[in-house]
Amino acid sequence: MARIRLVEHAAGAPGLRWFGLGPDLKPSRGLLKLRRLLHKHAFWAQQRTTADLKRMLAGSTVAVSLWRGKRMVGFGRATSDGIHRAVLWDVVVAGDLECRGLGWRVVGALLSAKAIRNAERVYLLTTNRSGFYQQMGFEPASP
């Protein structure tokens, strides 16, 4: 099995957004592969267009992707003011590779990014993965 590589994109993910860059800053049709990953493995993102993804990435403080060879197998992003609040968004791992620690790797990379780790509070929204995030120390918000 090919090794899985983590790519930490610059703020706004310009390489991924404009040039489709993947590992080693090589053109890899990354934006198309992100769209494919979201459409196949994230029911909440199936209607997102390429234009939507470009705008989403442009507004992201942090974005990371996981690659196995030329295939994007994971993704996550976050926004933050760098001091008070941060929010994790769009964390997804290819279904055939779930339960192998890849989600932990994506979330860990997001949480260790300077703009996120310096935030007083980190929030996220999840529909059906609350158990995963609770294992990482997140708690349900009180009303």
Whereabouts are the PLM-identified features?
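Short amphipathic alpha-helix that is part of the acyltransferase structural core
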Residues: 1-48
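Conserved acetyl-CoA pyrophosphate-binding loop and the N-cap/start of the following alpha-helix
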Residues: 97, 101-109
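Conserved active-site alpha-helix within GNAT-family acetyltransferase domains
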Residues: 116-143
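Short alpha-helical functional segments enriched in proximate histidine and acidic residues
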Residues: 113
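A conserved beta-strand-loop-helix scaffold within acyl/acetyltransferase catalytic domains
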Residues: 48-92
